[in-house]
Amino acid sequence: MKVDINAVKELRNLTGAGVGDCKEALNSCGGDIEKAKNYLREQGIAKAYKKSTKDVSDGLVAVHVNGNQGAILEVNSETDFVARNEKFQKLVLNLVSLANQYAVEDIEDFLKHEYVSGTSIHDEIMTNIAVIGENIHLNKIGYLSVNAGVVGGYIHSPVVNNLGKIGAIVALESTADNDKLNVLARQIAMHIVAARPEALSVDLLDKDILDKEREIIKKQVDQLNKPVSVAERIIDGRIAKFYQDVVLLEQIFVMDNQLTISELIKKKESELGASINLVGYKLFVISK
């Protein structure tokens, strides 16, 4: 049968599928656009499952903050070309908004929730794989909230608002003015992106990481042949420097090298007249 070009255009606008696929679908469904939509979906998901095994090494990080809660997620694609695709970017922004709405971090649970189109999030990702033509993988989700205070976020060098290759969210618990807390939270999120800490506090630093570093430092100091008391002071000093490199609260604030992050918070507590507790952060990076 001869396919109506206007029907092809309408089907393409509705699905994002290629002209050839739209013609094939309309031919197979007798020109019925609704049936053709379902046909494309069935064919597309079958193709998508084949593509979903391909390696993904690029993608985008997205941030969505809303008052006292916020979400961050990483969605991977095969190439930077797709990461710059408007349809892919819209998908990622919708996903991070839904992650914030559903307040979840578990990916399997999240994929079962409803997408804005009414389908499951899992099925929507599969549909986008079929339409875009590359594997798309939801790699990580982070979510933070506080009863009183704010969650702030930052994306470095965004490709569009709230989308980029590296981003962070920060939760500050406080009864201080939210507008001023938001400024502080964003500054700390910017610091996190620049300094890339591995833990919030010394107590939360992975014991294996600390033990390995202490062993390396001890071997270095042993070679100096110093008295035990001197060697112990050198080791303590180097461990303190290590904390300053990898622990957020011990790091030197990138916007003021006279303050650590802990000291910055104490300074803001004095200025705002309320205690401020940095309860958590999430840092996601697209790394090839």
Swiss-Prot record:
InterPro entries: EF-Ts_dimer_sf, Transl_elong_EFTs/EF1B, Transl_elong_EFTs/EF1B_dimer, Transl_elong_Ts_CS, UBA-like_sf. SUPFAM superfamilies: Elongation factor Ts (EF-Ts), dimerisation domain, UBA-like. Residues 79-82 are annotated as: Involved in Mg(2+) ion dislocation from EF-Tu. It comes from the Bacteria. One of its GO terms (cellular component) is cytoplasm. GO terms for molecular function: translation elongation factor activity. Keywords: Cytoplasm, Elongation factor, Protein biosynthesis. It is found in: Cytoplasm. The keyword Transmembrane helix does not apply. Pfam families: EF_TS (PF00889). The keyword Cytoplasm applies. Associates with the EF-Tu.GDP complex and induces the exchange of GDP to GTP. It remains bound to the aminoacyl-tRNA.EF-Tu.GTP complex up to the GTP hydrolysis stage on the ribosome. Belongs to the EF-Ts family. NCBIfam families: tsf. HAMAP family: EF_Ts. This is Elongation factor Ts. It comes from Ehrlichia chaffeensis (strain ATCC CRL-10679 / Arkansas). The lineage of its organism: Bacteria, Pseudomonadati, Pseudomonadota, Alphaproteobacteria, Rickettsiales.
